[in-house]
């Protein structure tokens, strides 16, 4: 039976991204809530972040700066995911992106999705009218809408190689 590690502490600050605005979510970011309005863009860098409630409205956009690199978001609250992912290779994005839901609140994923969701205590509602999803999903109950297509992509982040040069 899958179990969750302890939920990270959630800060008391909230972040909203409005029309024509963008924000870069980066390693160690921590928000009580994050909302991206229609026309707003969320750039996501590799790392590990913690968010209470997340709401990505229809018409919002997401761009992974380094698709495939390990990117984990810990959630501890409600999830509404209606955004469009701007990256071309959604399979590569899915290999590096994972959400861990620590609460039992229902997660609604209506927009494009690429990544794994680990939410053993939460219900998942996936896909709406001809949406395509890439990744793996674990939830208490999972509902997949009739027009959704899911492609199995394992969480298997790419490794960043570093080259060190020495001079004698």
What are these regions (language model features)?
Residues 16-157, 168:
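Long, polar low-complexity repeats
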Residues 1-10, 162-168:
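Boundary/junction segments of secreted and surface-exposed precursor proteins
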């Amino acid at each position: 039976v899958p179990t969750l590690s302890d939920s990270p502490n959630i800060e008391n600050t909230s972040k909203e991204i409005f029309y024509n605005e963008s924000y870069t979510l980066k390693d160690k970011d921590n928000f009580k809530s994050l909302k991206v309005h229609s026309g707003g863009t969320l750039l996501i860098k590799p790392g590990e972040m913690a968010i209470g409630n997340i709401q990505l409205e229809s018409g919002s956009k997401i761009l992974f700066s380094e698709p495939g690199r390990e990117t984990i978001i810990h959630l501890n609250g409600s999830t509404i995911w209606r955004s469009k992912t701007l990256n071309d290779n959604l399979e590569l994005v899915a290999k590096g992106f994972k959400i861990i839901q620590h609460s039992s609140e229902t997660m609604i994923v209506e927009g494009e999705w690429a990544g794994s969701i680990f939410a053993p205590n939460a219900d998942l509602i996936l896909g709406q009218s001809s949406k395509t999803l890439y990744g793996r999903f674990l939830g208490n109950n999972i509902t997949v809408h009739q027009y959704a297509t899911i492609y199995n992509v394992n969480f298997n982040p790419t490794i960043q190689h570093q080259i060190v040069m020495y001079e004698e």
